[in-house]
Every structure is written in C-alpha cells, then in structure tokens.
Design a protein with these regions (language model features):
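Walker A (P-loop) ATP-phosphate-binding motif of ABC ATPase nucleotide-binding domains
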Residues: 2
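Conserved lysine of the Walker
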Residues: 13
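Conserved nucleotide-sensing/catalytic segment adjacent to the nucleotide-binding pocket
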Residues: 27-82, 87
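A glycine- and Lys/Arg-enriched "phosphate-lid" helix/loop adjacent to the NTP-binding pocket
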Residues: 87-139
C-alpha cells in the first residue's frame, strides 16, 4: 500500500504519518526533513524530486508525508490512499505557534525536521503563518485540481477531526492484520 499524507501546516500530518508507520511498519519519508537539508536552489529542487522518486520505486509500500505541490502530482498518481487532513485555520496557526514555542523551551528538534533547522520569530516566520492562514484559498484549489486530473478521487480520504483520524487508524489496524 502506498499512502500520502497532505494538509496545511499544523494539521497533524507528521503525527498521523508516524502513527500510520507504527501500525503498518511501512517506510516513511517526511518531505520537510528532506527539503530542509537543502540550500533551496534549483539543483536542490531537482534532487528533492529525484529522492522522492527513488524512495517510491525502492519500496513496495510506503508513506510520504508533506505537500510540496511542485512534486505532488507524481505522488498522487503513485498513491493508493491520499489522506488529506483539513483543520480550521485558527487551529493550524495555534498548533504551529505552540510547537514552535515548545521547541524553543525544550530545545528539541522535531523528528520530521533536520537537527540544524531552527525557527526564528522574524518576517519569514510571519510569512509562514500567513501562508497557513491563506492555505485554503491559495493552495487547496491546486491540490484539488491535481487530484482531479489524476482521476484520484476514489483514493481520497479527508479527515477533519481527531475522531475521524482515530477511526481511520482503527480501520487501518484491522486492514493491516488481514
């Protein structure tokens, strides 16, 4: 089974992807971990796509977590399940700010980010929060279009609440035992 987990920052993608990995034992590729080890150049973008392709062809089953719409089309085509997490924008902002504060206080990095990655309360961070706030109107139409073009609506599972996530994980546990 090939699973992608998408959704705005703060929607719970990384957490859900790790839980799916615990249940299935499929290899997991967190795209933030991959991308934020680069210098963000044009060469890095090519490498980023190649690494995703290599991961997908090297593993019969996998989980890829992250949006990155520039490379999403190929992942949508390859995936058996598209898990799209949708949460209200205020909740996503709250979660992102809270995890940033926790990281600053605890001085720990996220497991889905490189050790060297650090967030600062600067203009770039505020732009990131603005990106999250406007994700629904600026990014969701592109994602919906990619899903439609790939004729992948039958692969799509939209999860909006903790309960829906838990029900999905419970169902996945049952499926993975069979």
């Amino acid at each position: 089974m090939k699973i992608i987990v998408i959704g705005q920052s703060g929607s719970g993608k990384s957490t859900l992807a790790r839980k799916i990995k615990e249940i299935t034992d499929f290899p997991l590729l967190p795209l933030d971990l991959l991308w934020h080890t680069t210098d963000y150049s044009i060469q890095a973008k090519k490498w980023f796509l190649q690494e995703q392709q290599l991961f997908m062809v090297s593993n019969p089953s996998w989980i890829v977590e992250g949006n990155y719409t520039s490379t999403l089309e190929e992942r949508i085509k390859e995936a058996d399940k598209i898990i799209w997490l949708k949460v209200p924008r205020y909740l996503a902002i709250y979660r992102v700010v809270w995890r940033s504060l926790k990281r600053k206080i605890n001085k720990k990095s996220r497991p889905d980010m490189p050790e060297s990655f650090s967030e600062k309360l600067n203009r770039e961070y505020l732009e990131f929060l603005s990106f999250i706030w406007h994700f629904e109107e600026n990014n969701e139409p592109k994602i919906q279009q990619l899903i439609q073009v790939a004729n992948a609506r039958n692969k799509l599972i939209i999860l909006k609440t903790r309960r829906e996530k838990q029900e999905f994980l419970t169902k996945l546990k049952i499926e993975s035992k069979n």
